[in-house]
């Protein structure tokens, strides 16, 4: 059984036991979170597509850890002006393990 969930402005295809990184969630490590924004639930040939969400669809997950992604370097440069601006950014994420899919 698999599902497509939306969280943090992105969509993820998940199955039970999957470990994935999502945008930072406000939950402690070890806590259980529920994703109610389920767009699709499938099991073999039986596929339920929501309009926009599947009624009664729910995905539960356990928060494994919080962290920060790799540093992305941003360089802004103006030619012939002796001007260069260099910045870095690290995005916060939450690592979750999918424990159940219903719907």
Curated annotation (Swiss-Prot):
This protein binds to 23S rRNA in the presence of protein L20. NCBIfam families: L21. Keywords: Ribonucleoprotein, Ribosomal protein, RNA-binding, rRNA-binding. InterPro entries: bL21-like, bL21-like_sf, Ribosomal_bL21, Ribosomal_bL21_CS. Belongs to the bacterial ribosomal protein bL21 family. GO terms for cellular component: cytoplasm; ribonucleoprotein complex; ribosome. The gene is rplU. Part of the 50S ribosomal subunit. Contacts protein L20. One of its GO terms (molecular function) is rRNA binding. This is Large ribosomal subunit protein bL21. GO terms for biological process: translation.
